[in-house]
């Protein structure tokens, strides 16, 4: 498992050489996976609290990491997609990340951006969380906020170094879903994405953003996005 920046380095996507460089911020990739074959996880139930959502993610993530090398990058990606979509408020995060441009998008474009955003997140996590070397993932508490609930946690790396990771949770129906991630209580994942997306939208428009997200996911997983 490698904990480091997850910023969109779209200059590595060969098919999009014109995308402007954006400032990279450190963030932590946090994800979870469903089992394939012999692996099994409990049937998903309505979460009682935001902490339950994060604990479920962490339990599944550890199981995926322990089988990471056997699954390979495409197998890890396939496992991560369903849990990412049931644990993260992908559409909400995509909307905030796109910013003011969201209001001018058609419903079809909004759906495409949300799907590509979720696919990119899953691919990045599958790439970063690829093995297990004794790491610990722990929920340490939760507290109410004006916009929902903040769940605090830490990832203890193999060398014993703790990394503080907090989750902003948003109520969606009966479930609490992750709407943002903060590294060291300061670096917002959504704010980082919004800064990066703004540069891409300015030069390449919404189609360029969708292509960049899919291109990055393709590069990380070797699985080409389906045509809409």
Describe the function of each predicted region:
Residues 182-228:
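Low-complexity, intrinsically disordered terminal/linker segments enriched in charged
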Residues 29-38:
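Bacterial N-terminal signal peptides
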Residues 47-125:
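Early exported N-terminus immediately downstream of N-terminal targeting peptides
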Residues 39-45:
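Sec/Tat signal peptide C-region and signal peptidase I cleavage site
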Residues 162-192:
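Short beta-strand edge/turn micro-motifs at domain boundaries
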Residues 122-163, 213-228:
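Surface-exposed, charged secondary-structure patches
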Residues 48, 63, 67-71, 75, ...:
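Surface-exposed, polar/charged faces of alpha-helical domains
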Residues 3-29:
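Bacterial N-terminal signal peptides that target proteins for export
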């Amino acid at each position: 498992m490698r904990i480091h920046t997850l910023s969109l380095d779209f200059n590595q996507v060969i098919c999009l050489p014109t995308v402007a460089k954006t400032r990279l911020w450190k963030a932590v990739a946090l994800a979870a996976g469903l089992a394939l074959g012999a692996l099994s996880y409990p049937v998903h139930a309505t979460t009682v609290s935001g902490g339950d959502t994060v604990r479920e993610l962490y339990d599944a993530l550890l199981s995926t990491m322990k089988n990471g090398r056997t699954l390979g990058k495409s197998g890890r990606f396939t496992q991560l997609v369903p849990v990412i979509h049931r644990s993260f408020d992908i559409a909400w995060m995509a909307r905030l990340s796109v910013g003011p441009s969201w209001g001018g998008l058609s419903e079809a474009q909004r759906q495409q951006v949300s799907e590509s955003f979720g696919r990119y997140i899953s691919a990045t996590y599958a790439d970063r969380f690829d093995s297990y070397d004794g790491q610990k993932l722990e929920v340490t508490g939760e507290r109410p906020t004006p916009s929902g609930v903040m769940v605090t946690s830490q990832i203890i790396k193999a060398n014993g170094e703790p990394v503080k990771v907090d989750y902003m949770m948003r109520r969606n129906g009966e479930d609490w879903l992750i709407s943002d991630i903060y590294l060291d209580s300061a670096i917002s994942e959504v704010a980082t994405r919004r800064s990066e997306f703004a540069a891409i939208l300015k030069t390449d428009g919404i189609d360029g953003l969708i292509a960049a997200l899919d291109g990055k996911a393709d590069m990380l997983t070797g699985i080409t996005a389906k045509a809409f």
